[in-house]
């Protein structure tokens, strides 16, 4: 269009000109580029006649998607399911700390896959006296970088099942701009190589679930398409339903072939930081938030101590507290198992650097060993890195960023210095680099004067 006018709107979706890339005018009507794309998708669907042959003039769809299929891989048996102690032992190899959360998840996951084995044996259907086993989804509550996603990912790795991660903040209610909840299932299906049976036994982790809380516990009189609306859309999926998943993603339309996935066997793990939830719990318990957990400047308590106290308060969490926070009762009822993860202190961060199977220190040692350099980290350097990560308040995620900063110049210079066979990162190097100074490199004048 020759002239921009914010008052002009698409006659089909109602978006104004400043919300779309292109708005095309017709005799008394307007259509935006997004609606044109949707029309093209509908028209591009392969049209067939009553005999199943392509209709004359019909063109195949532009996007070729792999066909969904069912595998011959047998369902898990009771004997093949690892016991809770075995599950926790495996988690200990990858995740440091969080013992209470590991125990909760080990039991919940064991019971979930026992339920699948029970159904696979047909006992739940043939025995009249058999008790119906309902699934128990899991809610993880903890600050950023404390290991929520890693716990879920490690479980899926141990059980050898497909695993998908979704961000709740991108989801919207059907009919609005954003992702439909069915797109979560598409990610899981893609992780399973379009194997429907495998996907139906997988694990889905929905992150940032606290961001879809409604603004108050009272039902909203206005449309909340990314909060309460998403919670409502997730209800059936969490409980168990046969969902129609568009194989190409995006919005569903009437002429699109969809893949049907039964979600009753999928384990959903929801996680979020739930900032401020401890205040809701304290209010219910009748404790003054300021007096019970004073700010750092009033009593000299550190922020770390406050975070630890918040985790201790959340041990008294009740479903009604989550309702007051903004989750609807129906949503909470479909996630009956909850676990509170504690914030990571400096000692735990030190352990994360060195102890897990894929610890960061081991990763960088392996990288430099390919250049015939034996890399070592002094104990006080490990402590300094953990202290800096703790100061940044982003949990274990800060560790990789700090080491990458420290090692950047080293990894740039060392491969070209064949005479250097070993190198030790010291505390002074960590402190100098995190303070903005250049890290001395081996064989340079800067190192000789240090």
Curated annotation (Swiss-Prot):
Component of the ClpX-ClpP complex. Forms a hexameric ring that, in the presence of ATP, binds to fourteen ClpP subunits assembled into a disk-like structure with a central cavity, resembling the structure of eukaryotic proteasomes. ATP binds at residues 143-150. This is ATP-dependent Clp protease ATP-binding subunit ClpX. Keywords: ATP-binding, Chaperone, Metal-binding, Nucleotide-binding, Zinc. ATP-dependent specificity component of the Clp protease. It directs the protease to specific substrates. Can perform chaperone functions in the absence of ClpP. Residues 1-51 form the ClpX-type ZB domain. InterPro entries: AAA+_ATPase (IPR003593), ATP-dep_Clp_protease_ClpX (IPR050052), ATPase_AAA_core (IPR003959), Clp_ATPase_C (IPR019489), Clp_protease_ATP-bd_su_ClpX (IPR004487), ClpX_bact (IPR046425), P-loop_NTPase (IPR027417), Znf_CppX_C4 (IPR010603). Belongs to the ClpX chaperone family. Residues 50-78 are annotated as: Disordered. Disulfide bonds: none annotated. The keyword Transferase does not apply. GO terms for biological process: cell division; proteolysis involved in protein catabolic process. Zn(2+) binds at residues 10, 13, 32, 35. GO terms for molecular function: ATP binding; ATP hydrolysis activity; ATP-dependent protein folding chaperone; protein dimerization activity; unfolded protein binding; zinc ion binding. It comes from Synechococcus sp. (strain CC9902). GO terms for cellular component: HslUV protease complex. SUPFAM superfamilies: Glucocorticoid receptor-like (DNA-binding domain), P-loop containing nucleoside triphosphate hydrolases. Gene3D superfamilies: 1.10.8.60, ClpX chaperone, C4-type zinc finger domain, P-loop containing nucleotide triphosphate hydrolases. Pfam families: AAA_2, ClpB_D2-small, zf-C4_ClpX.
């Amino acid at each position: 269009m020759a002239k921009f006018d914010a008052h002009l709107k698409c006659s089909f979706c109602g978006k104004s000109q400043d919300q779309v890339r292109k708005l095309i005018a017709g005799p008394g009507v307007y259509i935006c580029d997004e609606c044109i794309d949707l029309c093209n998708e509908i028209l591009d669907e392969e049209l067939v006649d009553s005999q199943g042959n392509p209709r004359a003039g019909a063109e195949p769809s532009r996007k070729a998607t792999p066909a969904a299929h069912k595998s011959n891989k047998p369902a898990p048996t009771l004997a093949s399911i690892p016991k809770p102690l075995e599950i926790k032992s495996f988690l200990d190899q990858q995740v440091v700390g969080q013992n209470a959360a590991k125990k909760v998840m080990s039991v919940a996951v064991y019971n979930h896959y026992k339920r699948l084995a029970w159904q696979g044996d047909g006992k739940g259907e043939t025995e009249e006296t058999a008790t119906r086993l309902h699934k128990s989804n899991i809610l993880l509550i903890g600050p950023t970088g404390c290991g929520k996603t890693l716990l879920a990912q490690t479980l899926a790795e141990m059980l050898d099942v497909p695993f998908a991660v979704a961000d709740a903040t991108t989801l919207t209610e059907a009919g609005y701009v954003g992702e439909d909840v069915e797109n979560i299932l598409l990610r899981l299906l893609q992780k399973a190589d379009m194997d429907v049976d495998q996907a139906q036994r997988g694990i889905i982790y929905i992150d940032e679930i606290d961001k879809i809380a409604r603004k108050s516990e009272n039902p909203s009189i206005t449309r909340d398409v990314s909060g309460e609306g998403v919670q409502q859309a997730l209800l059936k999926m969490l409980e168990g339903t046969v969902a129609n998943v568009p194989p190409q993603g995006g919005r569903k339309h009437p002429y699109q072939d969809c893949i049907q996935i039964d979600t009753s066997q999928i384990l959903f793990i929801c996680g979020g930081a739930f900032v401020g939830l401890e205040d809701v719990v304290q209010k219910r318990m009748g404790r003054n938030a300021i007096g019970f957990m004073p700010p750092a400047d009033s009593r000299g308590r550190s922020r770390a101590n406050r975070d630890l106290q918040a985790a201790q308060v959340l041990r008294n969490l009740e479903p009604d507290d989550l309702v007051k926070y903004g989750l609807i009762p129906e949503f909470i009822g479909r996630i009956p198992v909850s676990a509170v993860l504690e914030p990571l202190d400096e000692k735990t961060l030190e352990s994360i650097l060195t102890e897990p199977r894929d610890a960061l220190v081991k990763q960088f040692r392996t990288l430099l060993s390919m250049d015939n350099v034996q890399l070592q980290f002094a104990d006080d350097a490990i402590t300094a890195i953990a202290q800096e990560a703790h100061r940044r308040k982003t949990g274990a995620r800060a560790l990789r960023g700090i080491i990458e900063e420290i090692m950047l110049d080293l990894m740039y210079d060392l491969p070209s210095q064949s005479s250097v066979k070993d190198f030790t990162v010291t505390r002074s190097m960590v402190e100098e680099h995190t303070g903005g100074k250049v890290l001395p490199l081996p064989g340079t004048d800067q190192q000789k004067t240090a």
